[in-house]
Design a protein with these regions (language model features):
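Flexible helix-coil transition and linker loops at the boundaries of alpha-helical arrays
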Residues: 97-98, 112-126, 158-168, 202-205
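N-terminal cysteine/histidine-rich coordination modules
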Residues: 1-84
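Start-of-helix signal in alpha-solenoid helical-repeat scaffolds, especially tetratricopeptide repeats
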Residues: 103-106, 120, 124-132, 147, ...
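Structural motif corresponding to the intra-repeat A-B loop/turn of tetratricopeptide repeats
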Residues: 140, 144-147, 184, 223
Length: 235
């Protein structure tokens, strides 16, 4: 609080649309409010006030093109045509730049996903959008849809790995692939990815190495619990 004025969590930034070049305002959460009180093992964070993830996607009110700050900065002619034919021609002008609730955030992410798929956006962008949608369903308590989109994000993350390979800075990608496998109950696949993080000498990310070891240990406990439950069910 400065001079008796209470600082609001949201502020506006100007964005130039990558599709139609229209300049518009979209909301962001101030850094001082980005303090998660809890974070899941796949980096899904929880906040007491505004959730910054609700505002990652910016939506052009003029044409409906939705993207993130990491998306393509300017579409080429082919991408513009693809977008208009499949998305833009049906857009009804409206402003999504203000405060967002969970449903608004979900709508913005799904629109961004559609736009990304239509224009052939990079796999890393698509994977991140899919993963964020899974988080939104987790906030909502919709486990079926959460797992559905975790599965989609897993496929995309693996495609990123296959196309780009892995370097010393990609421990987080390998860890995420392993952790999503674990969350989907695919324990053996998860172990294979966690082991890459732990055993690859090129990887120097101590936090991801430690996290991979912890989740590997958790899998062993989960498998043991499953076996004990099966034995009890038979007796």
């Amino acid at each position: 609080m400065a001079n008796g004025v209470k600082l609001e969590p949201l502020y506006s930034i100007k964005v130039v649309c990558a599709q139609c070049e229209h300049e518009y305002l979209t909301s962001r959460v101030r850094p001082s409010f980005k303090k998660a009180y809890r974070t899941d093992t796949d980096f899904c964070a929880y906040y007491k006030t505004e959730n910054p993830d609700f505002y990652v996607v910016r939506v052009c009110p003029e044409c409906g093109f939705a993207s993130t700050e990491n998306s393509t900065l300017k579409l080429n002619e082919r991408q513009i045509t693809l977008f208009y034919d499949q998305v833009g021609c049906r857009w009804e002008k409206r402003d999504m730049g203000g405060p967002r609730n969970l449903e608004d955030a979900l709508e913005s992410y799904k629109l961004a996903l559609l736009c990304a798929q239509v224009i052939g956006e990079r796999d890393r962008i698509v994977a991140s959008l899919l993963h964020h949608i899974a988080w939104l369903y987790r906030y909502q308590g919709n486990e079926e849809q959460e797992k559905r989109f975790l599965g989609y994000s897993l496929e995309s993350y693996i495609r990123v790995f296959e196309l780009e390979g892995v370097g010393a800075n990609d421990a987080r990608l390998l860890y995420l692939i392993g952790e999503i496998h674990r969350r989907l109950g695919q324990f053996q696949e998860a172990i294979q990815w966690f082991s890459r993080v732990v055993q690859d000498e090129k990887i120097m990310d101590a936090a991801m190495i430690r996290a991979s070891r912890e989740q590997w240990k958790l899998i062993a406990e989960q498998i043991r619990e499953q076996k004990n439950a099966a034995i009890q069910a038979e007796s």
